[in-house]
Amino acid sequence: MIKEYKIKSLILRQKFKDHKKFKKQILNYWKEGSDEPFKIKDDYYNDKLEKSDWPLANNWDRPWIKYAAPSIHQHLKLFAQHLGYRDIKLHKLWYQQYGKQDLHNWHIHDGSYSGVYYIELDKKSPTTEFLYADNPKKSFTIEVEEGDMVFFPCYIMHRSATNQSKKRKSIISWNTDFNNIQKQYLDNRPKIDRLKK
């Protein structure tokens, strides 16, 4: 029999600084790009996106990446430091645009933490939906608005449900790992809690 031990795992949210200016520039880059609709339908996936550059997620030479990656990294570094780490390493960075009826079904990511930056988000568009780790038959969402970044553990099952809005939804997503623990925690000798059998 598998014994469960509940531990706290955090999901973080923060506004992206200068979102309006950043949004305008990013959308121009994507409009000028040659990315195409993204569709997967098999025994596992049934995803449909208006546009995405996911197949190029580890290519750091894309024009929008050269513009966006430094600012995104700075925001992600703040999340990492909030969790007790010194810095963060971006492995993959990509965008997704959802038209009406588009969907990115249940999935997970590789790495330590992933997340979503909501570039365009209508009030009728779905936000990221998560499954509880201790009860995957129940889901939850977080109250967010356009311009928010949400940072969450890669292992949490999540999706973007079908977009019912007539307005497009646009996001940036990433896969990351942490670099080094902050010194204050290395020298710390906390009281140890023993989890019962």
Please name every model-derived segment.
Residues 1-85, 103:
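Non-heme Fe(II)/2-oxoglutarate
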Residues 87-161, 168-171, 175-189:
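Catalytic core of non-heme Fe(II) oxygenases with the double-stranded beta-helix
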Residues 43, 163-166:
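A hydrophobic alpha-helix/topogenic segment detector
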Residues 193-197:
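Aromatic-enriched
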